[in-house]
Amino acid sequence: LGPSGSGKTTCLMMLAGFETPTNGEIYLDGNPISNIPPHKRGIGMVFQNYALFPHMTVFENLAFPLRVRKISKDDIDKKVEKALSMVSLSGFGNRMPGQLSGGQQQRVAVARALVFDPSVVLMDEPLGALDKNLRESMQYEIKHIHESIGVTVVYVTHDQGEALTMSNRIAVFNDGKVQQLSSPDKLYEEPVNSFVAEFIGENNTFSGEVIDISENKCKVKLNSGNEILANPIRVKSKGEKTIVSLRPERAIIDPKNDMDNKHKGKIEEVIYHGDHTRVR
């Protein structure tokens, strides 16, 4: 996960073998693969534009990677039928890609990447061209396929909601470096730096100085002069400069009970969003 130009797709292309690393080594199941050509790495790939062969039927598209690997005809028939069933497209084998909807084409692309039992599947923003409802539906579908067959999926996206929905672990990229690698909840609750805090979810940030610290609380004096009690993530000592992060959903407007961090403010704008209201 990361903004445009952060190095996500370059990283994926190195894993696939389409880019050559300038330093280091890539290991797959403990074996170095940097000098192995892409077609011999045994890695499945799903692109944003699907890359289906338009002159082949759905069955032939799925059979192609198996024929290249010299699989027998009987095994090809079984594997293709199993892969189509996995993506809920049984009975679509004789259709041409042009006869399918965008969501169906995407499922064929996923099935083709899985049909030869790869050890890893790489997905490069595969849902970017779909509308919102179909994209959300496909997120759950890919997640369920992953859970049912247990294959490792490396999935590139700039959509943080998509990353939080689908992932066991998320690597946040910026400027070619991994800023944080952790579970979705840890990424959201305990960002390691201000970039991750501001990139994941929405955030209000305040600069200040730590004036007191204990094991699970610290007091920060903001540049405005207000004092805030906060969770000390990566805070080491009194006197250091820090940034306080406040998620919008954690703010309570006009609380009925007395509580910490109670401050006066002025509402400038109220925006209705259907299932929630934004207050600025």
Which residues does each PLM region occupy?
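Conserved coupling/switch loops of ABC nucleotide-binding domains, chiefly the family-specific signature
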Residues: 22-25, 75, 175, 207
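Conserved ABC transporter NBD signature motif
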Residues: 24-32
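A position-specific signal in ABC ATPase nucleotide-binding domains
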Residues: 19-20, 27, 67
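ABC ATPase nucleotide-binding domain helices that frame the ATP-binding cleft
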Residues: 9-12, 108
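Glycine/charge-rich catalytic "coupling/switch" loops of P-loop NTPases
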Residues: 189, 217-271
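Walker A (P-loop) phosphate-binding loop of ABC-type ATPase nucleotide-binding domains
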Residues: 3-6
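Helix-to-loop junction immediately C-terminal to a conserved catalytic motif
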Residues: 16
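ABC ATPase nucleotide-binding domains
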Residues: 38-44, 48, 52-195
